[in-house]
Amino acid sequence: MKIINTVQEMQQITNELRASGKSIGFVPTMGYLHEGHATLLRKAREENEIVVLSVFVNPLQFGPNEDLDRYPRDIDRDENVAKENSVDYLFYPSVEEMYPAEQTTTVEVVKRTDVLCGKQRPGHFAGVAIVLMKLFNITLPTRAYFGMKDAQQVAVIEGFVADFNIPVTIVPVDIVREEDGLAKSSRNVYLSPEEREEALHLYRSLCIAKERIETGERNAEIITTLVKEYIETYTKGTVDYADLYAYPSLQVVDKIEGRIILAIAVKFDNVRLIDNITLTVK
């Protein structure tokens, strides 16, 4: 595995790889890699000749009161995970390397961002779109891999790739969970033992809702109320949202049909957790 720190060197390598006909699988991350990221890397390894991993904590996608400085970082750990999963190139640029001057151009995402996490994080998805536009141009991937834990991000990325005719296939990968059901997240390290136990009820609430839908419930409000009340009953967390939308359009639905997403965000003392399920309802 080779570690690359500059845009120029990474671009030169990927240009040469694509010119020689090699397929490139790209996994963009903010580091502190866990089994969820490793699953993306293994999928990329299976489907491509070359695997490129980026580790970059992108300041543009953090709001003024968000946890940029607290976001966990451990490049030694990340290198080990990369090597264990047969990564060919680890792209690890500094903020100054990625943003050497103030941006003169931005990307405004106008659909799929005014609900779920986007509703409470204005500018977040613009920051995501900017860094991905840069990373796609630097790494020239054939395929790029994203976890469905942030399903809204996947929907936004699929939309902006289609809008700008970016020649990359977006590959969504199912949420990776702990054995007890908790969705793997770099932020789980901030949970107290009590919160860690309570956090199990997030996925349980989604499973209960899924069972209700599969046994015939089609009223979206009944389902979201059930999820919210369950979480409020069994945890001390604050429910930011428990919402149901068509997916990937993220349009409001009253009647549950077609492909839908049921998504939740719950704030504990020091960490905000998200989770979701997607399913197709006939």
Swiss-Prot record:
- Which residues are named in the active-site annotation? H37
Chain sites annotated for binding ATP: 30-37, 147-150, 176, 184-187
- What residues bind beta-alanine, as annotated? Q61
Name the Enzyme Commission number(s) assigned to this protein.
6.3.2.1
Kindly state which reaction or reactions the protein catalyses. (R)-pantoate + beta-alanine + ATP = (R)-pantothenate + AMP + diphosphate + H(+)
The molecular function terms of the Gene Ontology recorded here are: ATP binding; pantoate-beta-alanine ligase activity
Q: What pathway annotation does it carry?
A: Cofactor biosynthesis; (R)-pantothenate biosynthesis; (R)-pantothenate from (R)-pantoate and beta-alanine: step 1/1
Give the subcellular location: Cytoplasm
- UniProt keyword annotation of Ribonucleoprotein present: no
Pfam families reported for this sequence: Pantoate_ligase
**Principal location listed in the UniProt entry:** cytoplasm
Entries under CDD domains matching the protein: PanC
Report the GO terms under cellular component. cytosol
Q: Which UniProt keywords apply?
A: ATP-binding, Cytoplasm, Ligase, Nucleotide-binding, Pantothenate biosynthesis
Miscellaneous section: The reaction proceeds by a bi uni uni bi ping pong mechanism.
Q: What does this protein do?
A: Catalyzes the condensation of pantoate with beta-alanine in an ATP-dependent reaction via a pantoyl-adenylate intermediate.
Subunit note: Homodimer.
Q: State the similarity comment.
A: Belongs to the pantothenate synthetase family.
What name does this protein carry?
Answer: Pantothenate synthetase
